[in-house]
Amino acid sequence: MVFDARLGYDPDEWEECPEPEHFLVFSGFTRYMLTFAAIAFVYYFFKLLDDKNKKESGEKEEPQTSVESVLAKAGDKLHDVKEQVQQHIPESAEELMREADQYLKEQAHSVQNNVHQFAEQAANKFPSLEVDLNLGHPIDATREKFDTVLSSVNNHLHETKNMDLSPTSRDSTQFEQIPSIAPEESAFGHDFEHVPPHLKTAAEQYYAQQHQPPPVPQHKIVQPVPISPTDQQLLHEFDIYDAPAHQRMNQISEQLGQLGQKTPAQLQQLQHAQLAHQQLQQQGVFQPIQQPSPLQIQTHPQQPYFDFSQLSPASQARYNQQQFVDISQLSPGAGALIAEQQASGAFQPVTKKLGREKRLSEQDERALQDWEKEKALLEADRLKKLLDHEVGGDSTDLDSSQKAYDHFAPASHISYESHSGAAQIQPMTPTAPKRADVPAPQVTSITNVRDSQLTDYDISDFHAHDEPHYHTVLTPQQLQQNQQQHQQPSAIDRRRTTADSDDYVKVSEPIYDYPPKGHEAPVAEPKRISPTEAAQLQELYQEYDLGLDLPGVAPIQGVAKPPVQQRTPLQIQQQVVQNVQNQPNMMARQNSVPESPRTVINVPISRKTDVPIQVQQQQNQFSYNVPIQVKDDPRNLATADLFVQDAQEYVAHQQNQQDKGSFVMEEEMLSLHEPETGSNKKKLTPKNPSFEATSRQVRTNDVFERIEHDEHDDMTYAPEIQSVEIPPDQMSETSENMIDYFDKVAAESEQQIQHLQEQQNTLKKQQIETSIPDSSLLKPVGRAPQILPAFGNRISSNSSLGSAGRSGSGVSSSDVYPYRHLRKQSSLLSVLGVTSMQEMLLAITSLDSLSEAMRKAGLETTNLIFGIDYTASNKYQGEESFGGRSLHTIHPHVTNPYQQVISILGRTLAPFAGQGRLGVYGFGDAKTGDWSVFNLKGEGGDCRSLDEVLNVYNTVTPTVALSGPTNFAPLIYQAMEICQKSRDYHILVIIADGQVTNERATRRAIVQACQHPLSIIVVGVGDGPWDMMRIFDESLPKRPWDNFHFVEFHEIVKKSTNMEDGDVKLAVQSLLEIPDQYRCICELGLLDRSIPPRGSEIRREMMHNPL
């Protein structure tokens, strides 16, 4: 340390620190050694791994190489075997016969060689025998020569055996020195002369004197013949070289005797084969050899062959019977054709080539029997059908191998061609009756029909019997008798078959049952239709309101025949002729099968002054009259015509769309109705529009497809409002533009209306009932759309809002479209004696006073249904209107917009609760999405009070997962189902936070709801936008009455001075149209109740009877 005086330290006072001690764990040498050891370990470790990997790879490569070599060897061997087999397989019967001849020649040459060798050996061993070595005889004389040789040898052996020799002398050296030879091949002897008598004399003298075998002279002793290696091997093989003489002689005798029995049989078999071969050559037909030749057995010892002797008697009998054709059941003319073809050799049976080595099992036998029966029935019926209807196919045989397989394979594994000709006829059923209405035809040009010209035809009519009967070929006399017996047709039981079954064959053209020429086909009497079908028939005319005033279904009366001449406009009764199915053109059906019966509905109509309109269809002319009100406003008539055209084009477009899966399309919902009969009048009840509403979950985005180019629906379909915000001050201009458009169209059609009025005046005093043809012939003539009542008959009025018992003045334009002038004639305004909304708000100061005014306006009872929007947009829709909080916020001291709307409308309509039930449904959550709704009460049903509704909402809302998108259609259909079940008036209050994403589906649901006693009120909560809702409320021209109303909650509340004032304003603007909608529902017959008075009548009564 360096000392510095400025630090102020004294060096003497410093403490000296001891030097630190260093402890080394390993010395330097140790460290070097450890490093070297580590490096060496790593080196050897990786080397070991490398060697191991190489070893494993080498082991893998070695078996791979061996496998490849084995496969290569196997392939070469297989190739050699294949070539060897192909070389020895005979190609035809001629080659087999040639091989057989060659084989016999080789065998004959071998036999002659063996005989020559045997004769030489016999001459050497038996000097006393004189053997004829002339072997130039042909093979045909071999049997005779063999008999001569055998006789000579037997005689010689017999004489030698009967010599008077002692037992010891029998084993003399001369017999021991002569070894017996047992020839291996078939040895044939020639002519041996008898043994000389001196041999017998010398032996007798020797035995008589010496009582022992006499000495034989050396020149008389037969010396052993030198045996070649081949003979030596032959002797050892038969093991007779050391046998005693008498045993050897006995064996020679036995073997010669066997040869005498076997060889002639082989020769005889060969001769028979040659004769058969010559006969086949003379006939020009070669029949394959069923028994393989000896050369084939020798060359291919492993090749299996089929022996027909192994078949059971039943199988052999069936096999033999298949070679015959039974034509006893054929129609006249067919038997002669088949017999001629059989005589010419066209039906020669084909011998089956089979390769079996064992007998069939019992199960296979049963399967074969079933298959034979089925195949016999099929072929018999097929041929019968073809011949009876002058059709057929080529007369060709099946391939022999395919027939052999089909004969012995199970039925499930057999495939055959149904268009094979008569060459494959199988045993037939004893009786196959013909069709009663088709005479027996003649067979013509069967072989000219080809598969490309054939069509499917059902031949199942001819399965008259289950079990087949087998016959043999009959004589021409028997054929003629059978043909005469089966000329008379008989009735048969017909059954249908599918195109996949084996009963179908192909014919050249369809076969129809035409009536006899010169007789007209009887016209089938139309069947009566049920009231349900009648109601569905009426829906075709009034689904989109084509201008027919049909109050109900009249009793079905007589059948109306199609007009032959032009009818006059004067008719007794209107006849609505409607075919249940889509009928083709009438002229196109005159030359075809008699058409299906048509349904005739006679519907009485009220007598009006009508204008005849002529409609011509081909040669038949129809005249019908469509009623037109002379006093209708031309603007309304032109507008109605525009609407009717829109509806027709909409229906035509929707009919081309097919349903997707099992979903319920809204077009189908719009057309379903169910009639109900009352005591004195007919009632039509609409069917459930959505059937299982919430249980059948269908995505509306998939079902209700948006049509981007809807040229004729631009008045209600406004896609531009989804991307362009329309200021509120411009909405009135939009509505006025629509009215101006109606005025323009009305002015253009005014001239046409005047012309129709002139025609109507000419027929004003006549009583006309119109005959209307098919609905497709009708054209709109300016009638406003009208809808058939769902629960009762409509009153006799031409207006959708008119009343028969009221003023007799003409129908005003407001009656046709009341929603355009509803506020000017509101019943609430008339009851309160005010003329504007501001005056009404000043007159109504509480919800109770509003309820009393609605009761005076004619509202009797109603039921509430709440729809809660649970889409995810509720989270941010309250940025401006609800302080940035979610619209579904549940807090003890804060009331969200949903709770406020439920409370306000519930308190207002509580005095009108008819059934005391309040339905609460949610939509747009994660589970239901935009294709269904769910009940907040669960399976418990509806709520009983307003407090219960609020409690259920407060309990369920925190547990619901918000999702989307927004779609009102499922909720509207659920409300329609409730109305149908309860048959009571309902008000559906939909509380939503934004416009719907599927505008087209919602619009259709709103239009469909007009057929039910249902009013729809949409209360918009949140920041909006609400452009689409305003369009819905102002411009839905397809509705016969205004069933939809929209109010914006926050727009009303923020203009209010206090909370109570805001509640009253919301209730007034929400329920302003309810009394008038209720009156419209009663007038249309949707409710079987008394019709409340109009606003004008209420005002008139108040003026005459002031308080």
Curated annotation (Swiss-Prot):
First-listed, main subcellular location of the protein, grouped into a coarse class: membrane
Ranges facing Extracellular side: 1-22
Low complexity bias: start-end ranges: 478-488
Cell membrane listed as a keyword: yes
Keywords: Cell membrane, Coiled coil, Cytoplasm, Membrane, Transmembrane, Transmembrane helix
Domain VWFA: 863-1023
Tissue spec: Expressed in body wall muscles (at protein level).
Single annotated GO MF: protein-macromolecule adaptor activity
Superkingdom assignment: Eukaryota
Region described as Disordered: 478-501, 673-698
Residues in coiled coil: 67-124
Composition bias, Basic and acidic residues: 492-501
Subunit structure: May interact (via VWFA domain) with unc-89 (via Ig-like C2-type 1-3) and unc-96 (via C-terminus); cpna-1 binding sites for unc-89 and unc-96 are different. May interact with pat-6. May interact with lim-9 (via LIM domains) and with scpl-1 (via FCP1 homology domain).
Protein name per its UniProtKB record: Copine family protein 1
Species: Caenorhabditis elegans
